[in-house]
Structure formats: structure tokens, C-alpha cells
Amino acid sequence: MATTSSEEFSEVIERATSESIPNGELNLPVALEISDILRSRRIAPKDGMRCLKKRITNTTNNPNTQLSSWKLVEICIKNGGIPFLREICSREFMDTMEHTILKYDDSDEVVELVTTMLYELYLAFQNDSQLNYVSRVYDKLRQRGVKFPEGAPISSNVNALFDSKTPADWIDSDACMICSKKFSLLNRRHHCRSCGGVFCQDHSSKSIPLPDLGIYDSVRVCDNCYDDYDYKKGSGSQGKKRKHRKSHRHATEDEDEDLRKAIELSLRASNSSVEPVIPVVESEPQIPAVEEEDPDLKAAIEASLREAEEEKRRREEHAQQQNTNAYPQQFRPPANELTPADEEDIYLFASLVERMKTRPPSEILDDPQLQQLAQKVFASKPRLGNTLNSKIQKYNTLVDMNGKISHIMNTYDNLLEQELRNINLSERFNVPQAQADPYSQYSQYNQPAIQNNTSQTNNVVNNKPLSQRESEPQYTAPTDSQTIESKAYERQLENLVQPPSNVNNERVASEPPYPNEELNDITSIQLNSERAGKYEENAVPPGSIPYPIENDDQDETTRTKKNDNITNFDFPTVPARKLPENNVEQVEDKPQDSQEEALLIEL
């Protein structure tokens, strides 16, 4: 048995109490279906009560729908069973009934119906301890002066109004109620939908519908309930066999009579319905002179009459087919719209008028067929106006919708263009990625072009082998005048060598700003003069130690201090432009020449 959700149950309630039903009536078959759903417990009683209450609260502004909703509640109360009655008699629903009786002023019929229902519930359950809230609401309304129909005949047999059979509550047990077998993993338990007992598979394998419980699908029942229903069907069928034999003859006759009556009613309805707009016109030549003089007009009129007769014959055949197929109602076009026959009359009248322009007025006035056609066309003028207005309204609506669609499309295109523009801007201004080796960039761009001459000479000396370094004389620190001259020499070299202008990793050798010969001459002369002055001032007499021991210790201590920091490196200078190779060779060869000159001066 399939269950029903609250949404589906609410839809069925709306169909039963539709606003299209006049005078507060309801759809009775759908209402009985709702009561069967409640009685068979396909929906929980509380959920069913809340769906009905929701429909009542949502239709307070419509008296007809409100009346039909309360009528549906009355049917459900009398056919829903005891579990549903308990929810109706609860405080949640009784407060709604009390509020309707006291404060609903739109319809006296609704107030009277709700008052009668409350009084019936009070008479039926005034002695029930579980449903005593009905008595409290009744006493409260009596104190406020509400009048109840106490003298009505409903009080004599009110308990029979709520006597409806419902499925029994399920009983729990550990053994079958017929064979007493214990339930286990293999021997599963099953409940009977009729009596609510617990049975094994062997004694609950049958399934039948239970219409007296509101269950029209085949459900599982036990063997005892199946035998009871089978016996009831057998006893009922034996008593009806004799009556069935006697009434079988009359059944066929009744069917024939009903069919005959239905055909007669359909024929009457078709005759009373709207006749075709163009009736049959008798083709009696009243004015033979006009017909002889105008054969084209005569042929056109005869053709229109033949078409009208064929149209009438086709409609009669169609009506007969509908009657044989048990469709008594015929399709009727709207009264305020043009029919195809009206359109044909208008076109025919227009063509005839165009042809009659050359005829004298007397012939036009004497033609009775043309006069009848003119009357039909003039009678269809209001319908033509209504049709024209409806078409104009539809056209304006479509034009408005087209304008809205175009506006929406333009707005959507602008949004897309803005998004694409934002994406292009974000891609254009992305942050470049950092290089993998930061020291390479530092060595290329952040180092000065040329260091001072002391660092250059030290690098040249350090690159020599150890034996050659020991044979060369040691030098002392330069004086102030020598430092000034070295700084001036550094400025000259910086002016000669320009820093890189563009940030590229490629190093392109460029031509020096001056010819190589002049640059070689200048650098060789300056180096010779400076080193000659150094050796003359710092000449050491024979027999003396060139360097004190303390100075060696100090150099070692300073050298160890510098090496304490691992990252304290003196990176070699990478010039931005290629230096002439002759200068380097001259710098490396000059110390030997200066030594020879110093020895010659001493001699």
C-alpha cells in the first residue's frame, strides 16, 4: 500500500474545494477519496488534520471556498475513523473552530455549519476522557452566548455518525498467532492489514483489497481474514444469483433505452445550438433579367450557395458521428469572434460589390440575395471589431515582450564585455615571476662596473702562483696623496666605461669609446709613474725584515674575522663592456719592469 505525502494530500484537497465550484459546493468523489486516504492511514492523522487546517486558514477571504472546506472537514470527520477524530478533537484544531464561530462574519452559513459540527462532537465524546477538550470548548462558547442546535434530531443517534471501520493497530509478538512458530532470521514476521496481528509467511501469503477500510489496493492479510472476506463474498453472491437472472433481461433493454435517450438529447442540443452563420438560400430565380444580363454574378452566387450546402452537410455528418461516439456536446466557437463562414461571407460580399459598381442602382436594390448577404455581413461587424481589438492587444503584448527581450540581451552583452575587459586587464598587469638564482641578478646589475685599482691589483696578484708571490716584494699601505691619485684614476675609468642601459641577460661586446692605442698609452704611463713612486718611498734597506711579525699576525687575525661570516664574499667584478686585452697583459708585466728600474736607481 503506497503512502501519500502532505504535498499530494494538499493538492487533492484543493481539487475537492476548487474555487471554480459555485455556491460553496465540493467535488464529492474527490472528498470521499480524501476520507478513504485518512481512514486507510496512507497519511498520518496529524498530517491530514494540519492539511485541512491549512486549507481553511488560506481561504478566509473567500466565503464559498471557506464553506466547501468546512463541508470537506465534516465528511472527513464522519468517515475518517477514530485516530483522525482524536486529532480533530485536539486543541490545535478546536481553537480554529472556536475562532471561526466567534469571529467569522462573512457567511452565516459557515458559522452555522461549524457550530453544528462542534455540537455533534460534544454529544458523541462528552464522556470520553481522552477527548474532553471538546467539552471545555463547548462550555466556553456557551458562556459567551453562542447558541447550539439543541432541539435538532441529530442528538438521538449521534454516535452512529462517527462509527467508521478503520484498520486495526498492529500487535507485536514473538511467535505466529496461528501456528505459534517463533520468529527468527529465516522465519520473518508479517502484519495483517485487516486485524493487525503478527503471522509467519505461510499464514500471511494472501493479499486482497479491503474496501470497507478504505484500502482499494491488494494488501497482505492473514488466512483467517482472507477466509472471512471470501465467505462474505460467497454469501452475498448466492442471494443475488436469482435477482441477477431476472434483471439480466431488463438490463439490455435499459441500456438500449438509455442510448436512445442520449441520442435524442444530443440531437436536441445540436438543433438548439447556434446554426451556421450562412443559412441555406433557396435558389429560385426571382429576377431572370438580371441573371441573364450578368452570368458571372449568377455563377458566383450559385457557387457560394453550393459551398454553404456542403458545409451544412459536413456539419450534420460530424454531429451524427459525435452522437454515436457518446459525445453530446458540440464545439462552439466563441460568440464574440469571427467564424470561417463569416470570413467567407465578407470576402464574397466584397467581391460582389466590386463587380456591381458598374451596374445601375436599381439592379442592386432589386437583388434579394445580395441584400441578405449584406445583412449577414453587417451583423458580423461587432464580432469583427472584437476580433480586431483582441488581435491588437496580442500584437501590443508581443511588441512589449520583444522590447524587454532586446533590452535584456543588450544588458547581458554589456555584462559579458565588462567581464572580458576585466580578464584582459588582469592578464596584462600580472606580477612577473622571480628568478630562480638571486645571485645571478645581483652579479649582473647591482655590482659596480670597475673597482678601484687596489682591488684590481690584488686580484691580479692573488691569481699568480705561490712561488711567484713569495719572490715579489711586499708593499705597505698607500699614503694620502696616493689614495687621492687612485681616486682620480677611478673617476677616469668610470667615465670611460658606461653602465648597462637595458636590463638584459645577454652581454654584448661593444667598442671602447677611445682607440685602443691611446687607452693603452694612458694606462701604461699612469701605472708606471704611480708604481715608481711607491717603490722609491717604500724602499727597504738590506738586512732588515720587510714586514714585522706583528703585521703578519694582524693579517691572519683580520683574515679569520672576515671568514667568520659565510656569506661575506667579494664577488668578482663583471664589467658591462669588454676591456682591451693589452691593458691586462701590461698590468701583469709591469711589476718586473719596476723592480729592474729600482735596482738600476740603487746602483
From Swiss-Prot:
Residue ranges occupied by any UIM domain in the UniProt entry: 254-273, 292-311
VHS domain residues: 18-149
Highest rank taxon of the organism: Eukaryota
Protein's UniProt keywords contain Zinc-finger: yes
Keywords linked to the UniProt accession: Endosome, Membrane, Metal-binding, Repeat, Zinc, Zinc-finger
Family annotation (Pfam families): FYVE, UIM, VHS, Vps27_GAT-like
Major localization listed first in the record, in broad terms: membrane
GO BP field: ATP export; cellular response to nitrogen starvation; microlipophagy; positive regulation of protein maturation; protein retention in Golgi apparatus; protein secretion; protein targeting to vacuole; protein transport to vacuole involved in ubiquitin-dependent protein catabolic process via the multivesicular body sorting pathway
Membrane topology: Peripheral membrane protein
Region feature (Disordered): 233-257, 307-340, 452-483, 496-519, 536-603
Subunit structure, as described in the record: Component of the ESCRT-0 complex composed of HSE1 and VPS27.
Protein name: Vacuolar protein sorting-associated protein 27
Originating organism: Candida glabrata (strain ATCC 2001 / BCRC 20586 / JCM 3761 / NBRC 0622 / NRRL Y-65 / CBS 138) (Yeast)
Source species taxonomy: Eukaryota, Fungi, Dikarya, Ascomycota, Saccharomycotina
Gene: VPS27
